[in-house]
Amino acid sequence: MAAGKEIRGKIKSVENTKKITKAMEMVAASKMRKAQDRMRAARPYSEKIRNIAANLGQANPEYVHPFMKSNDAKTAGFIVVTTDKGLCGGMNTNVLRAVTAKLRELQSQGVSTQAVAIGNKGLGFLNRIGAQVVSHATGLGDTPHLDKLIGPVKVLLDAYAEGKINGVYLAYTKFINTMKQESVVEQLLPLSSEKMQAEKTEHGWDYIYEPDAQSVIDDLLVRYVESLIYQAVAENMASEQSARMVAMKAATDNAGNVIGELKLVYNKTRQAAITKELSEIVAGAAAV
């Protein structure tokens, strides 16, 4: 029964693994709900800022903020949002594949790139492919804080405002639902005029700006872009927990299937050993 003992050891090992993956699935499910709440809570804030800034822009059509101006620089910036940890399926792989495709497209046009990495997985990938990483933010935990993001991303925002780069792209995993997440590489800067259109309402707002409208719109647009980055990080975290929950559930189910197969093999092995012993006993009795 040496084989049977070995199989029992494998069953015990897989059962222990199943307990771990089940616990991780439950933890991810709990974190996913909190991450979704944060993601949804951030949307009204950025939308309200966008609408106020758009109203300001319409009231002051002669002023164009640097974030809405195009330039001819031969360098583009990337903000790449990934996770700090693994065990979340192919989520990071998919977004990094999309980033790679965009990098190659720009390089074929003679445009160099600079990158800000948010998350360990993206930072490691960008370093491996030899990308120019100008700043990074890692170890954000389960709750992203804007003050930890502002410093790293400000490097690219300032570079764009100064005309050193011709655009900023934001790459992250967009949360669709628990079972579906989508890799996105979208242009963050320059802000499109379509995006900055104010909502049509039944009544207009007559704002009083202090110290002046230009100062207010300068500050608002920076806050708006920062809120878009925060929203992307929040969406990425919701996607991470959803992907991890699904991956751990699949691992738990697979472990259950393996345990079932091992038990079947064990029972067959045990049955064969018992049959052999009975045959030997019968043969011995017949010989007597």
From Swiss-Prot:
Topology class, membrane: Peripheral membrane protein
Alphabetical GO biological process terms: proton motive force-driven plasma membrane ATP synthesis
CC per GO annotation: plasma membrane; proton-transporting ATP synthase complex
Location(s), subcellular: Cell inner membrane
Alphabetical keyword list: ATP synthesis, Cell inner membrane, Cell membrane, CF(1), Hydrogen ion transport, Ion transport, Membrane, Transport
CDD domains per UniProt: F1-ATPase_gamma
InterPro entries noted in UniProt: ATP_synth_F1_ATPase_gsu, ATP_synth_F1_gsu, ATP_synth_F1_gsu_CS
GO-annotated molecular function: ATP binding; proton-transporting ATP synthase activity, rotational mechanism
UniProt function note: Produces ATP from ADP in the presence of a proton gradient across the membrane. The gamma chain is believed to be important in regulating ATPase activity and the flow of protons through the CF(0) complex.
Subunit structure: F-type ATPases have 2 components, CF(1) - the catalytic core - and CF(0) - the membrane proton channel. CF(1) has five subunits: alpha(3), beta(3), gamma(1), delta(1), epsilon(1). CF(0) has three main subunits: a, b and c.
Family: Belongs to the ATPase gamma chain family.
HAMAP family in UniProt: ATP_synth_gamma_bact (MF_00815)
Descriptive protein name: ATP synthase gamma chain
Taxonomy of the source species: Bacteria, Pseudomonadati, Pseudomonadota, Betaproteobacteria, Burkholderiales
Gene: atpG
